[in-house]
């Protein structure tokens, strides 16, 4: 039987793709993309011309049977995100879970993840916990933060629209008992890191906040 490949792709710099990922994308019959327009940038760069179809959080349930029919008819299918590893704050969990129930072969082709790269840069200690995206609502977000344990480094992806308020929430909940490291646009031209107190980081960000951010914070023992 054919199989489903879960393929990691670059998070910014197209040169970060692995040889194995390229080999896989070149040999499969179909590629499921979070956004076909975004994926075409990578695929065109490496002259990969395969049938594409969208697979994202708004259609992942409805596309499951289509993917399974392709595989059961003998076609290999690769799943890729706009950037990084599928499943990590991106679609893929449901596909993998349901494929296992059907005993469909799965193979993961590893790639870059922003959270692991950011953690390495942070110099914060193990253990760490990846939170994905915190709640969009300030009240619920603060409740999430209050449940976290001290002595652990936490990693979160943060929208530029929620960044300042999230930093303020950290300060309100933890006061001086939190260390913060913020990085933006990892592997891209304007990659930049922000360190210091929360107030200092907010000042460094200024009024024009652009790009994709990864936030790491370490809760110190009170």
Curated annotation (Swiss-Prot):
One of its GO terms (cellular component) is cytoplasm. It is found in: Cytoplasm. It catalyses: cytidine(1402) in 16S rRNA + S-adenosyl-L-methionine = 2'-O-methylcytidine(1402) in 16S rRNA + S-adenosyl-L-homocysteine + H(+). Keywords: Cytoplasm, Methyltransferase, rRNA processing, S-adenosyl-L-methionine, Transferase. CDD domains: RsmI. Coiled coil: none annotated. Its EC number is 2.1.1.198. It comes from the Bacteria. Its main location: cytoplasm. PROSITE patterns: RSMI (PS01296). InterPro entries: 4pyrrol_Mease, 4pyrrol_Methylase_sf, 4pyrrole_Mease_sub1, 4pyrrole_Mease_sub2, rRNA_ssu_MeTfrase_I, SAM_MeTrfase_RsmI_CS. Gene3D superfamilies: Cobalt-precorrin-4 Transmethylase, Domain 1, Methyltransferase, Cobalt-precorrin-4 Transmethylase, Domain 2. Belongs to the methyltransferase superfamily. RsmI family. Catalyzes the 2'-O-methylation of the ribose of cytidine 1402 (C1402) in 16S rRNA. This is Ribosomal RNA small subunit methyltransferase I. It comes from Mycoplasmopsis pulmonis (strain UAB CTIP) (Mycoplasma pulmonis). The lineage of its organism: Bacteria, Bacillati, Mycoplasmatota, Mycoplasmoidales, Metamycoplasmataceae.
